[in-house]
Each structure stands twice: as C-alpha cells, then as structure tokens.
Amino acid sequence: MAIRKKSTKSPPVLSHEFVLQNHADIVSCVAMVFLLGLMFEITAKASIIFVTLQYNVTLPATEEQATESVSLYYYGIKDLATVFFYMLVAIIIHAVIQEYMLDKINRRMHFSKTKHSKFNESGQLSAFYLFACVWGTFILISENYISDPTILWRAYPHNLMTFQMKFFYISQLAYWLHAFPELYFQKTKKEDIPRQLVYIGLYLFHIAGAYLLNLNHLGLVLLVLHYFVEFLFHISRLFYFSNEKYQKGFSLWAVLFVLGRLLTLILSVLTVGFGLARAENQKLDFSTGNFNVLAVRIAVLASICVTQAFMMWKFINFQLRRWREHSAFQAPAVKKKPTVTKGRSSKKGTENGVNGTLTSNVADSPRNKKEKSS
C-alpha cells in the first residue's frame, strides 16, 4: 500500500519529475503567450514574427499566370523566431500523440521496456513521416515538379519560395529541433543518446543546407523520397511488435532503401553535377543567393555521397545482425532433434544403469545377491 501512495503523490512544483510529467502543459502556456500577444497592439509586432512567415514579396501578375498577384517568400534571420514557435507546437503535438494514441496501445500490448521505447519511437516517426510525405507530395504536384524535372536546376537560384514551400521547410527544421528536448522529456537512455544525436544532426544539416543554399527544390524531392522509405520501415516495425512473425514489410523496405539511395545519388549528381554546372551564372553572390560555384557544388555532392555511404553501412550492419539473430533462433530447433533420439535410447538403458554406470539398486538386486552368495 505504501508504494501506491507514493505513486499517486504529485511531485513538487518545478522539480525534475514535475517538468517531465507536465512539460506539454508548460510548453502550451509558453505558446499561448505568443498567441495572446497578437491581440494587443503593443505586442502584436513582436508576436507576429514568431507566428507568421516573414520576408514576403508580392509580384505582379504576368500574362501567362492568373490575373491575381503572387506572394513569394525568401529566408532571413527572423525565421529563427518562427522556427522556435513551431518547435513548441511540435512538442505539444508529440505529447498529444504519445498520450492519446501510443500510451493506450502500450497498455493493451504490455510491451517490455525495450519494446516500449522502440514502439514509441516508431509511432512518433511514422506519424511524422506520413504527414511530411503527403504534404511534400502535394507541393511537388501543385508546382509541377513531376511533369518537369528540369525545374530542379532551372532558373537557379531559387531564392523565392511559395508559402507552402517555405512553411514546409520551417516545419521540418522545427520538428527536428524539437527532438533535442524530447531526449530529456522521454527519459532516453544514455547509450541511445549518441545514436539519436547523430541522425537528428544529419537531418538538420541537410535540411538547413538545402534551405540556405537555395536548393529547396532538390531538397524537397529528396526529403519526400527519403521519408517514404523511412515511413515504410517504422510502420513495419510497429506491425512486427504486434506480431513477431511479420517480415514482409522489412523485405520490401530493404529493396526500397537501396533504390532510394541510388535515386538520391542520381538526382543529386544530375542536378548539382550537370544542371547547375552548365548554368550561365556561376558567380558567388550573397545578395541574390547564388551559390553556384565549383567549391559549393563539390561540398554539396560530397556531403550527400558521404551521408548515403554512411546510411548504406548502417543498413548492411542492420541486415547482418538480423541474419545472425535469425540463424541463432533456428539453431536450437535443429539441435533438439538428436536430443530426442538420445532420450529414447536412454530409456532402454535405464534397465542397466544411467549414463553407462550401474546404479546402487541394480547392483544390490536379489539376482546379484544370489550370484555373490554362490
């Protein structure tokens, strides 16, 4: 009874456990401060920097387009404030998914601690990957990326973005930045933190690089491709936790993972190595956002190639570990067959002894006693 009373007792205010249990409510209050600031004229100018997208430019309508004017956006230092606000939103959404979806499933399935943490990770990431993949695909279709692939490098620099494009990148940066405090909120194990930091850092590095170097068209295509493959992996792992015999999803993911790496390299080399290399304007100009110079192109291709090689190395190690576990699981089943035959033969030998030696009962049987007396 004493243990139950301790568990129901609320922790002290602003203590370590209090922050962990109520971090979503605390973050919600901080986000509400920015939203309430929009209601007052004094604070509206400061709050609007956090809530809405900045640096918009209105372009007049052309003859080819509609009669209405078009609003486009470019990036700037104020985007950091917007990323911070939507990082708070990502923390709130993370807590809602955890409490109202994943925790309920965990109570029904009764997972172990190891499976519990992996299930939560795959549940959160599969929801994010699905949403981002659908959103990114919608942008690709609406802006004719699929019908005209040359848009990846044509008219570079792509310093002006549509509302959907810029909001997509702001949301991506906000989500992966929110993953850092989630390591603390979710009580991540110390041995898992380095792995988490590596892939969070890789996401932020490549997304921010595509955003700042005005390679947002190429970055969007590669993100949608990568997110689709990762969504398939995490949704397969969710099905695997519910039924350990489920392996079809992993087999399909393994094929698509390799194809995804090849497509990433092909699109990157085609866009950066050939498309931008043949462009007329190849001068470094920070005012217009033109980074189409040889050094930048080599750095971009090198970072992409190194990342793809690192992912393939992790993938090969993952597959080897799975094959070892599968072979180790089948090995005891093969070894059990000869033990059954030995057991049958040992039953026949129990009349004379155990393991080739006479027992005391056999040695002292009446027949042996008669032979001894004679």
From Swiss-Prot:
Segment forming the signal sequence: none
TLC domain segment(s): 117-326
A Gene Ontology cellular-component term: endoplasmic reticulum membrane
Q: What is this protein called?
A: Translocating chain-associated membrane protein 1
Q: Which residues lie on this side of the membrane: Cytoplasmic?
A: 1-29, 98-121, 181-192, 239-251, 319-374
Question: Compositional bias (Polar residues) spans?
Answer: 352-363
Quote the biased-composition stretches of kind Basic residues, using this chain's numbering: 334-347
The record's annotation in Pfam families points to: TRAM_LAG1_CLN8
Where does this one sit in the cell? Endoplasmic reticulum membrane
